Amino acid sequence: MKSSARSAQSAWLVEKIISGGQTGVDRAALDVALELGIPCEGWCPRGRRAEDGVIPERYPLQEAPTSNYADRTALNVRDSEATLILAKSPLRGGTALTQKFADRYRRPCLVVDPREAKSSAIVIAWLSANNARVLNIAGPRESLRLDVARDAANFLRRLLNRKLVTKKLEPKRVVHTTT
């Protein structure tokens, strides 16, 4: 039997998290991935620039060619299979730009409020429907909404701290008998 990450009996809900390292949702995504042992990476602005200063080295991020946040956002969307935005609508600033880049790169994009109870089920169904395993996670920075990182981290722990069973079903063998 040929094996691959996607046909394994049991695999993480996502195989890799991509995020940009900004305060808020980006860091929450990276923190939860590191905590759960899910591979993570992403692009950050040149100089590891974020609203609180330099992004700590513990985050496995590659510096983009420029210090422009928009360039970093485009690279993260491009390098993912889908983008999950954790935010309450309407989207603003860089979060809205993330959604525009998802449209440009023709990547599935879902916006959910991490404080809504039904959001986990919606995300699981969306990931399965899109067969998305490399997930860009984005949302507001901490200065735009207090506690956004905490809410995002709690949501992502509940969402990602489970296995997605991808058991390959064998076709049923039908035996006809005559009497």
Give the location of each predicted region:
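Low-complexity, intrinsically disordered tandem-repeat tracts enriched in small/polar residues
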Residues: A5-A11, E170-P171, V175
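Acidic/glycine-enriched connector segments
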Residues: W12-V134, R141, V148-L159
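Charged phosphate-binding loop/patch that engages nucleotide di/tri-phosphates or the phosphate backbone
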Residues: L144-T179
